[in-house]
Amino acid sequence: MVTISDVANLLSRNTINYSIIDYPEKKKSIDIITEEQNDKRRILVLKINNSTSDRRNFRILFDLKKISEVTESLPLIIDDNIEDDVVSEKDGVFSMNLYTLERSLRGEKIFLLKTRGGIFVRVDSKKLREKREEKNMSLGELSQRLGVSRISVYDYEKEDSYVSIEVAEKLIEIFGDEVIGDIIKDYDSNTKKKKELQSDYNEEVKILEKLDRVLSDANYKTVKFNFTAIDMAAIKGSEKLIFCTEVNTLANSLKKFNEANKIASKINAKLLVIAKSSKTSKVYEKENFNVYIYNDIDKVVDESS
């Protein structure tokens, strides 16, 4: 069984400054914390051999997540039960064995993520797009070679994703192993994610506020929704309009729009999609949605009247 001393020795061999936390004597959530080094290596918050009851395990995970949010550090549980070269994740906290930690500290890529659904491979979205464009390969061509939808490939390139081992092997065969990502290096703390989510939320509010202003000026009655597929409805006389904004990924946006279309068809309303950019609007138009980009919201009233 790996010990705190084992981990400390590994950190020392890699010239990483660390402190062992000795309080409390039992039921600790943090055993070791490291120091950030020249912005090249993030802070690590480590718990060693977390073989605790489910209830205490939840509390330990919660503590690790909280300090990660405050420091933008990487929370890690060092667990002998995890296979070599594999990372397990629960509630935003990673688990790996000592060998995998050693490989990561040497700068080697750690790209296998184990979940309840199986083992998946991290993809580097920027590198994937770069390699595809170098080969002058379209999204459609790549999707056919991978055996996935064009929307899936678009999402792979938009945001670092996890793919099946089968898809990863095909990507390596086509582009080389540069397109494979690194779970540890690419880790975003919850703080950063929250900032990104808040930014997305603020952008959605901005879109809906502008839309509401344009429609109200044209004498439409508007209502907003928070917990369904549609974001806003507008009524003027017998005319009924339903509006949807984009969400975090293209695939989720299309799912949202398709569900909103079910509502629109049942109440005899016209569904209008508001896209953030002309690039995504073209994708939605190919799926036969009526689309306006944010800068053209003023045209909604003119073309609906």
UniProtKB/Swiss-Prot annotation:
UniProt keyword list: DNA-binding, Transcription, Transcription regulation
Q: Which residues cross the membrane?
A: none
Start-end of DNA-binding region:
139-158
Keyword Secreted included in the entry's annotation = no
The protein's superkingdom reads: Archaea
Tell me the InterPro entries matching this sequence.
Arc_TR_HTH, Cro/C1-type_HTH, Lambda_DNA-bd_dom_sf
Is ATP-binding one of the keywords UniProt gives this record?
Answer: no
Can you say what this protein is called? Putative HTH-type transcriptional regulatory protein Saci_1344
User: Domain named HTH cro/C1-type: which ranges?
Assistant: 128-183
Q: List the GO molecular function terms.
A: DNA binding; DNA-binding transcription factor activity
Q: What PROSITE patterns does its record include?
A: HTH_CROC1
